[in-house]
UniProtKB/Swiss-Prot annotation:
Methylates the ribose at the nucleotide 34 wobble position in the two leucyl isoacceptors tRNA(Leu)(CmAA) and tRNA(Leu)(cmnm5UmAA). Catalyzes the methyl transfer from S-adenosyl-L-methionine to the 2'-OH of the wobble nucleotide. Its EC number is 2.1.1.207. It holds the Pfam family SpoU_methylase. This is tRNA (cytidine(34)-2'-O)-methyltransferase. The lineage of its organism: Bacteria, Pseudomonadati, Pseudomonadota, Betaproteobacteria, Burkholderiales.
Amino acid sequence: MFHIVLVEPEIPPNTGNVIRLAANTGCMLHLVEPLGFSMEDPLMRRAGLDYHEYAEVRRHPGWTALLRDMQPDLSRMFALTTHGTQSVYDTGFLPGDWFVFGAESRGLPPELRETFPPAQRLRLPMLPNQRSLNLSNAVAVTVYEAWRQNSFLTPPTQPQPA
């Protein structure tokens, strides 16, 4: 389906929530290190409940490693940022697209964000003078909009519990 990328996430329950979202939508979750917590953190595990076994989660030692190992189509990668120039709702998404989110306290590093063409720097609408949405909420809104655009197409295969 879609690829969710969290670059240097800091808050365990947010990542747990995104793991649960990935399991329920058929998305693959990519975690770009360093992480601000242990993958065994009880708060992260609690937020993800028993969905960890249903989600496909890959860890990457850095952004360059993700690009090298996964070889994504760069034209289908979207940076979600409050500095975005285009709304998620004005963008057409395709199965296999990549949604890249930054750390909770600082977003995407500017040097990474600037590698995305302006049309691939997306934002979620908010009221003026508001800083940002919670990371897991922003991921959920984006994934569900992309999935809606694709008629809630079910992925061909679902990861099975071990």
